[in-house]
From Swiss-Prot:
A GO term for molecular function: ferrochelatase activity
Location (main, coarse): cytoplasm
Catalytic activity, EC: 4.98.1.1
PANTHER family cross-referenced by the UniProt entry: FERROCHELATASE, FERROCHELATASE, MITOCHONDRIAL
Protein's gene: hemH
Pathway(s): Porphyrin-containing compound metabolism; protoheme biosynthesis; protoheme from protoporphyrin-IX: step 1/1
Annotated family: Belongs to the ferrochelatase family.
Organism annotation: Methylobacillus flagellatus (strain ATCC 51484 / DSM 6875 / VKM B-1610 / KT)
Name of protein: Ferrochelatase
InterPro entries listed in its UniProt record: Ferrochelatase, Ferrochelatase_AS, Ferrochelatase_C, Ferrochelatase_N
Residues given in the record as Fe cation binding sites: 211, 292
GO cellular component, one term: cytoplasm
One BP annotation, GO: heme biosynthetic process
NCBIfam families: hemH
Domain of life, source organism: Bacteria
Length: 344
């Protein structure tokens, strides 16, 4: 089998296009232990995610985690799975499709948008293949992670590059590293919160929860923590909040090592013990609702807050297919497509 991939057959009249590859984490095929096992194996075998020595991690992964965790995770996925499928997949597909339509209003040159998932299907490799088949000789890689982390943004870019280095006719490549302080992104998050408050009233405190990563990665130079702090402060400023009206926390800790703090779970429980009448939680680092927002934050977080003695607990949905967010995606993409496309 040849190492370099065969180029797709493209009709001579097919125009050259600019491709946008929208990338997100991915999801299992079904909320079952059988479907979770290969998904978790791929996810937890990623060196960007787990940096332990491979022989040690192989025994932990195959001897413990893949024996116990699939069944546990399947139960959690079942609580958020709907008729259309997993929310992350459904929303990501809508985002890619809507972005393609919204770009038509802004650019006149030929282009195409595809969705690729880092783990599971549709894979990043298959999405790149579709863009190549559409005669895309320039491709913008757009990971839907506002804040850069090696375990998310870099992992998605790694996977794209692994496919591209096997490409015989290499396209021009640009990457969106992050957009943590992009005005359109901050505006979209702040507006979604503001609209929620217009319908449901305001809380005593807003908690902005970001996905956690091991503290060690920060010590080694990963900018994720600083970018989360910047995003949170910019959103708070856009909402006109004082420092005592909001807090930033980190969720989804995995394992026993120290992760970025403050941890979400003990923080939300402590707010409950303070007898706050109402707390709202939003997850600015997630472009789409998923297991971590709908189960961990909306369900588990609520239980912790109420058990602590708190009053009302509100989860503010992720940006999903929000019109303001799709327009923000367009602006972020256009900023990185300069010189490649013709604006209307």
């Amino acid at each position: 089998m040849a190492y370099y991939l065969k180029e797709p057959s493209i009709p001579t009249q097919e125009p050259e296009r600019t491709g946008i590859l929208v990338m997100n984490l991915g999801t299992p095929e079904a909320p079952t232990a059988k479907a979770l096992r290969p998904y978790l194996r791929q996810f937890l075998s990623d060196r960007r995610v787990i940096e332990l020595p491979r022989p040690l991690w192989w025994f932990i992964l195959n001897g413990v985690i893949l024996v116990l965790r699939p069944r546990q995770s399947a139960h959690k996925y079942a609580t958020i799975w709907d008729k259309e499928g997993p929310p992350l997949m459904v929303n990501s597909q809508k985002q890619a499709r809507l972005l393609e339509g919204y770009l038509h209003e802004a650019i006149s040159s030929p282009y195409a948008v595809e969705l690729g998932m880092r783990y599971g299907s549709p894979s990043i490799a298959s999405a790149l293949g579709k863009l190549k088949a559409k005669n895309c000789n320039r491709i913008l890689l757009f990971p839907l992670y506002p804040q850069y982390a090696a375990s998310s943004s870099a992992s998605a870019l790694d996977e794209a590059m692994r496919t591209l280095i096997r490409t015989r006719n290499m396209p021009e490549i640009r990457t969106i590293r992050d957009y943590h302080d992009h005005p359109a992104y901050i505006h979209a998050v702040a507006k979604s919160i503001r609209l929620y408050w217009q319908q449901h009233g305001k809380p005593e405190k807003l908690v902005m929860s970001f996905h956690g990563v091991p503290r060690r990665t920060y010590d080694l130079g990963d900018p994720y923590y600083d970018q989360c702090q910047t995003s949170g402060k910019l959103v708070a400023q856009a909402l006109g909040l004082e420092e005592d009206q909001y807090m930033i926390a980190f969720q989804s800790r995995f394992g026993t090592a120290e992760w970025l703090q403050p941890y979400f779970a003990p923080s939300i429980q402590a707010l409950g013990k303070q007898k706050l009448r109402r707390v709202d939680v939003v997850c600015p680092g997630f472009s789409s609702d998923c297991l971590e927002t709908l189960e961990e934050i909306a369900m588990e977080g609520k239980s912790l807050f109420l058990e602590g003695g708190g009053g009302e607990y509100h989860y503010i949905p992720a940006l999903n297919d929000n019109d303001t967010w799709i327009k923000a995606m367009r602006e972020i993409a256009l900023d990185n497509l300069q010189g490649w496309v013709t604006r209307r």
